Amino acid sequence: MCLKMRYERIKYILLFSLMHLVYSNSTFESFTENPHISSQISNVLYMDQMFIIYILICILLILISVIVYLSKRYSQQMMQSSDNITNRRSNPEVRNKSNIYDLPPLLDVTSVNEETPIVKRPINERIENLEFDPRFEIDQAKLEISEDKLGSGFFGEVCYGLLSMRTSNTETDTLQKLSVAVKQSNDPTQENQEKMIEDETKLMCAIGRNPNILAIIGAVTANSGSARNLLIVEFVECGDLLKFLEEKKSIFKDELVYEKNGYLLPKSIRRKTYMFNENEDDVIEESLDSLCTSDLLSFSYQIAEGMEYLASIPCVHRDLALRNVLLNKNKTIRIADFGLARKYQVDGYYRITKGVGTPMPARWMAPEVMREGKCTEKSDVWSYGVSLYEMFSLGELPYSNVSNSDVFEHVVQGNQLPMPQYCHPKMYDRMKQFWNFDATFRPSFSKCVEFFEEHLSVSATNLLEQIQKTLKSEAERQSKLEDWIRRD
């Protein structure tokens, strides 16, 4: 019936068009002056206009549905791809790398005081559900603590120490000593200070060992009758990475150069590349009297490796910056200080948002952390991007022209850090992805590691192989630290 009516309307239109051609304008106008005919023409034209609009709306809705479907499908593919990467990285046969990623945590964090597996939330948000593993208890008589301070903070201090161990049970054996760092509260009578050391000890037990994470050796706790809690960790010889970059800036060797054909292009768009000598087996010099682009790439890759390990636990760092990355004399790094200071409202470089709430290192914090206090792997990724700015600028302060109190407003207005002087353009493109305001669009740390592996495999294969070989040796060395708590 509807089709028949539509057919009749079309006939009317064709008829009137034909009449317009056959008769003169005056004749046609006189014909259409008939009110009945004029009304029918208007109705037909109006209905046809409505029909065309209806068709256009249907087409628009179909296009929107297709776009939404393709978007969801793409998101699912990206999630599946991310899962595949994670599985590949955790499978030594597939990954064909060293076994440094397969070291088991020293505490089974999925079964400690938990009805629900602790992996459902970051362990530093579930610290009250963890218990100290008694296997890490150290006899204080075997520990010598020097008066030499390695560092100090609002609640605690770190001192150099020596831990003693005999190689066997015979009377003639010599006593071995291991250099360690000992963390203790400033005032053992302050309950909150002691609680902070206790919580950090439990957290480090749960994290386990990774060559790019500062490893726990043991602890002296109140369970052994001690008057104060002592946390014993690896001694990292060269202090924090930020200070190292600042001190070595004058001898830095820039290995990032313009391509030979760059003169054909305007300087602003000339392409940069690395100038590595791939004929050398060791791209990185272990001497601490040298610093070059290869070192910066190595440090950046190692931080991503360590953060990927933390994210797999999961553990959110919450305070990632180069001041919290330590450097060994063989140029391997250790990520330290897992943000527990924020829980206890330590000031200093932190600021309080609008005068209340928990303290924050504003220059490194993601916007959602400043607004909502929500810390996730993706907020750590934002901080990692800021740390890379520090890295490739050789220690420049992020947003150096902005005061602490104005950093938040500066960031939320869409201002990003500029490309550092010694940064490859492809690296900077990646860094800008870390600073996406929508955290879901920031890459995971697995993706960060994958980026560096692809980046280095193309530009510096020997450098990548050297880093991975060194990290394997560090993992083996860390595994031997258990001897110092298992032998009497």
From Swiss-Prot:
The gene is kin-15. It is a single-pass membrane protein. The lineage of its organism: Eukaryota, Metazoa, Ecdysozoa, Nematoda, Chromadorea. GO terms for cellular component: plasma membrane; receptor complex. ATP binds at L150, G151, S152, G153, F154, F155, G156, E157, V158, K183. It catalyses: L-tyrosyl-[protein] + ATP = O-phospho-L-tyrosyl-[protein] + ADP + H(+). It comes from Caenorhabditis elegans. The keyword Ribonucleoprotein does not apply. Residues 144-458 form the Protein kinase domain. May be specifically involved in cell-cell interactions regulating cell fusions that generate the hypodermis during postembryonic development. It has a role in the development of the HYP7 hypodermal syncytium. It is an enzyme of class 2 (transferase). One of its GO terms (biological process) is cell surface receptor protein tyrosine kinase signaling pathway. Keywords: ATP-binding, Cell membrane, Glycoprotein, Kinase, Membrane, Nucleotide-binding, Receptor, Signal, Transferase, Transmembrane, Transmembrane helix, Tyrosine-protein kinase. Its main location: membrane. PROSITE patterns: PROTEIN_KINASE_ATP, PROTEIN_KINASE_DOM, PROTEIN_KINASE_TYR. The chain crosses the membrane at residues 51-70. Glycans are attached at N25. InterPro entries: Kinase-like_dom_sf (IPR011009), Prot_kinase_dom (IPR000719), Protein_kinase_ATP_BS (IPR017441), RTK (IPR050122), Ser-Thr/Tyr_kinase_cat_dom (IPR001245), Tyr_kinase_AS (IPR008266), Tyr_kinase_cat_dom (IPR020635). It comes from the Eukaryota. Residues 71-488 are cytoplasmic. Belongs to the protein kinase superfamily. Tyr protein kinase family. Residues 1-26 form the signal peptide. It is found in: Cell membrane. Its EC number is 2.7.10.1. CDD domains: PTKc (cd00192). The active site is at D319 (proton acceptor). GO terms for molecular function: ATP binding; transmembrane receptor protein tyrosine kinase activity. This is Receptor-like tyrosine-protein kinase kin-15.
